[in-house]
């Protein structure tokens, strides 16, 4: 079974602080996770860190993280960091 979550907006330090409880819950779910990134126009190191945190937690439990609808700056940054190689798209 897979769970879906739509990221509500940009993934910067301020928004990641607000989203932390939700992201902790998602990372603890015992199922694959798909994150819809269609509303994310900007991501900084806090957002990247949150995605890596979720990815590692899911991977350690045998589950996968998939990012959907990556575009613009988030796609460019995650591609540059080679995170799109480890996260299914």
Where are these regions (language model features)?
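Short beta-strand/loop segment at the start of cytosolic alpha/beta domains
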Residues: 1-6, 18
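Amphipathic alpha-helical interaction surfaces in cytosolic regulatory modules
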Residues: 13-87
């Amino acid at each position: 079974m897979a769970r879906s979550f739509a990221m509500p907006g940009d993934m910067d330090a301020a928004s990641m602080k607000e989203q932390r409880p939700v992201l902790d819950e998602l990372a603890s779910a015992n199922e694959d996770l798909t994150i819809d990134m269609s509303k994310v126009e900007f991501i900084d190191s806090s957002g990247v860190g949150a995605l890596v945190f979720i990815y590692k937690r899911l991977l350690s439990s045998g589950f996968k993280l998939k990012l959907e609808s990556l575009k613009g700056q988030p796609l460019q940054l995650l591609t540059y960091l080679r995170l799109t190689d480890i996260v299914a798209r």
